[in-house]
Design a protein with these regions (language model features):
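Short, solvent-exposed loop/beta-turn-alpha elements that line the ligand-binding surface or hinge
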Residues: 1, 47-51, 69-99, 128-160
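Ligand/substrate-recognition segments at binding pockets and active sites
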Residues: 1-62, 103, 131
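Extracytoplasmic/secreted proteins, especially bacterial periplasmic and envelope-associated proteins
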Residues: 14-25, 43, 66-69, 89-96, ...
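Sec-exported extracytoplasmic/periplasmic mature domains
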Residues: 24-32, 49-53, 76, 95-105, ...
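Preference for short coil/turn "hinge" residues that link or interrupt alpha-helices
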Residues: 37, 64, 78, 116-119, ...
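A glycine-rich, aromatic-flanked flexible loop/lid motif
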Residues: 60-64, 83-86
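Conserved, well-structured core segments
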Residues: 125
Length: 160
C-alpha cells in the first residue's frame, strides 16, 4: 500500500480546486489517500522554505522568454527551488549554456539539462496559464508575454 500523502497549498480558490482535482485523481486512479493541507500565505511559504511538506502546489510564470527562466529555478540555492533536488550535471549544463554565445550550442545544452529534469522529475508541471485576447487591428505595439505586462508607452492606435 502506498502511504497517505499530504498536498500543501496556499489559501486561494483556484489552488484549492487544483488540490481537490489532484486528490480525486490520485485516489481514484492510483488508490492513494491524499490529505489537503490549506495554509495562509505566510505559513505556506515558511513550510515550503524549511521543507515541511510532502507535495506542495507551487507556481512559476516565466519572467522572460527563454527556457532558462524555468530551468534555472531548480538549481540549488535558488529561492524558488523548494524541492531539495540537486544534480551536478544539470547545474554544469546550465552553467555552460549560459556562458556560450553560440545559440545552437546553448539550446542543445539547455535541452540536455531539461532531459535530466524530465528523467528525475523533482517537479510535476500540471498546467500553464492561458489568456484569450481580442484586439482591434488598429492596436499596434501590443505583444503577448508570460507575465501579461504591457507598458502603455509602446501601445498605440493606427488606423488604416
Amino acid at each position: 500500500d502506498f502511504p497517505k500523502l499530504e498536498i500543501l497549498f496556499n489559501t486561494n480558490e483556484d489552488h484549492r480546486k487544483i488540490a481537490l482535482a489532484i486528490q480525486q485523481m490520485w485516489q481514484t486512479t492510483l488508490g492513494i489517500e491524499v490529505e489537503l493541507v490549506n495554509q495562509d500565505w505566510k505559513v505556506y511559504l515558511n513550510r515550503e522554505m524549511i521543507g515541511d511538506f510532502q507535495v506542495s502546489r507551487a507556481g512559476w510564470i516565466g519572467d522572460y522568454e527563454d527556457p532558462n527562466t524555468f530551468l534555472d529555478t531548480l538549481r540549488p540555492n535558488r529561492g524558488n527551488n523548494k524541492t531539495g533536488w540537486e544534480n551536478k550535471k544539470y547545474d554544469d549544463l546550465l552553467e555552460l549554456a549560459n556562458s556560450t554565445n553560440d545559440t545552437e550550442k546553448r539550446y542543445n545544452l539547455l535541452m540536455q539539462a531539461e532531459r535530466i529534469l524530465i528523467d528525475e522529475m523533482p517537479i510535476v508541471p500540471l498546467y500553464t496559464y492561458v489568456r484569450s485576447y481580442q484586439l482591434s487591428e488598429d492596436v499596434k505595439g501590443y505583444f503577448p508575454n508570460y507575465l501579461d505586462h504591457h507598458h502603455p508607452k509602446y501601445i498605440y492606435l493606427e488606423r488604416d
